[in-house]
Amino acid sequence: MVSPVVYLVVAALLVGLILFLTRGRGRAAAAAQEPLHNEEVPAAAGRVARPQPLEPEEQRAAGRPRRRRDLGSRLQAQRRAQRVAWADENEEEAIIQAQEEEDIEKPVETHLSGKIGAKKLRKLEEKQARKAQREAEEAEREERKRLESQREAEWKKEEERLRLEEEQKEEEERKAQEEQAQREHEEYLKLKETFVVVEEGVGETMTEEQSHSFLAEFINYIKQSKVVLLEDLASQVGLRTQDTINRIQDLLAEGTLTGVIDDRGKFIYITPEELAAVANFIRQRGRVSITELAQASNSLIAWGRETPAQAPA
């Protein structure tokens, strides 16, 4: 069974269709009667004055109302005017945009001819100023990067130089220590061969510990005595005189002892400080005689001790 709602919808559609057809017929009848009425008015007016002929463009078409023709003409004119205005506006915008793009590349001086306004000129100047500022900042950043790279390269170069100097210094110190150890070992071998204790006509070679101890006592005895007779020193330490002289010369060459051996067979021990004082005296006086040097040495060099040290046994 069909729902009542369907019947209601169909009835509403039929009523709407009837109203639409009725209204359409009324409009058609009114449009047909209007030309007849317009023709009667000029005929009656022709008895008084002859009507002027109409222009071709003002003649209306058959069956077309004047009002509708005028409305269409106005709409067409408005559309044409609107299209022209839109075309002009788009053309003006394109020209302005192209001119702005061209003005960005041109210097500001080219716009001083008065063809553009002050406001636009100010905007262009601001754009140019911002562009110049960006370029200056970019150049400053590049220069800063270049300087930082240069400083970093210099730092690395300086670090490398210091590292090489440190390595060279360590190598020199290592070689000096090795050479010192080698000299000490050679000196020990010489002392071991030379120092002989003569006891009851039988010579015995000293041990390593005895040799070091004997050498220390030998040097200490000379330093405390200041002036020693080489023959007496040789007899006291149990060495031959020539061996004693050779040992003292070796110690002088090594820098262990400082002093002089005179022509009377004596060794005079002089400390490095006393040697510096004598050298300073000679340098200050210029030319010095032996007598003056001997007199000055009495005050510059401490001769002997109140209690001389005992010679090594």
UniProtKB/Swiss-Prot annotation:
Pfam families: DDRGK. Its main location: endoplasmic reticulum. SMART domains: DDRGK. It comes from Bos taurus (Bovine). Residues 73-87 have a biased composition (Low complexity). GO terms for biological process: cartilage development; negative regulation of IRE1-mediated unfolded protein response; negative regulation of PERK-mediated unfolded protein response; positive regulation of I-kappaB phosphorylation; positive regulation of NF-kappaB transcription factor activity; positive regulation of plasma cell differentiation; positive regulation of proteasomal protein catabolic process; positive regulation of reticulophagy. The UFM1-interacting motif (UFIM) specifically recognizes and binds ufmylated RPL26/uL24, resulting in stable association between the 60S ribosome and the UREL complex. This is DDRGK domain-containing protein 1. Residues 29-313 are cytoplasmic. Gene3D superfamilies: Winged helix-like DNA-binding domain superfamily/Winged helix DNA-binding domain. It is a single-pass membrane protein. Belongs to the DDRGK1 family.
